[in-house]
């Protein structure tokens, strides 16, 4: 029975996808285990890659600034580096904080 309960979210995703194939995954918030299940569904045997940021990078923006070459007197270089860092969004930013589509999930498949 534990195995059945484990696959319940995946079965729910499959049901939603089959009932409205054009709208079920147009764009959705996917977080935690739901995000992992969706990646398994989209990527299948290819698998997927995910490299989360360390807790230090998430919690301390000053550390991220220093690692990007920022700090006092960095000026335009610091601004440019922060803009580039913001453009490099991870899957959690794309799909949990914001919303994402199946096509965006496929970018994380091997």
UniProtKB/Swiss-Prot annotation:
GO terms for molecular function: hormone activity; receptor ligand activity; transmembrane receptor protein tyrosine kinase activator activity; zinc ion binding. It comes from the Eukaryota. Residues 57-87 form a propeptide. Residues 1-24 form the signal peptide. Disulfide bonds join 31-96, 43-109, 95-100. It is found in: Secreted. One of its GO terms (cellular component) is extracellular region. Insulin decreases blood glucose concentration. It increases cell permeability to monosaccharides, amino acids and fatty acids. It accelerates glycolysis, the pentose phosphate cycle, and glycogen synthesis in liver. Heterodimer of a B chain and an A chain linked by two disulfide bonds. PANTHER family: INSULIN-2 (PTHR11454:SF33), INSULIN/INSULIN GROWTH FACTOR (PTHR11454). Belongs to the insulin family. This is Insulin-2. It comes from Mus musculus (Mouse). The lineage of its organism: Eukaryota, Metazoa, Chordata, Craniata, Vertebrata.
């Amino acid at each position: 029975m534990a195995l059945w309960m484990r696959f319940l979210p995946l079965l729910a995703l499959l049901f939603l996808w089959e009932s409205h194939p054009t709208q079920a995954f147009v764009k959705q918030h996917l977080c935690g285990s739901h995000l992992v299940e969706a990646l398994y569904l989209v990527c299948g045997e290819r698998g997927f890659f995910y490299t989360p940021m360390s807790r230090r990078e998430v919690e301390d923006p000053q550390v991220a600034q220093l690692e990007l070459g920022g700090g006092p007197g960095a000026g335009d270089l610091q601004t440019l580096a922060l803009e580039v860092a913001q453009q490099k969004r991870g899957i959690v930013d794309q799909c949990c904080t914001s919303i994402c589509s199946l096509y965006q999930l496929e970018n994380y498949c091997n």
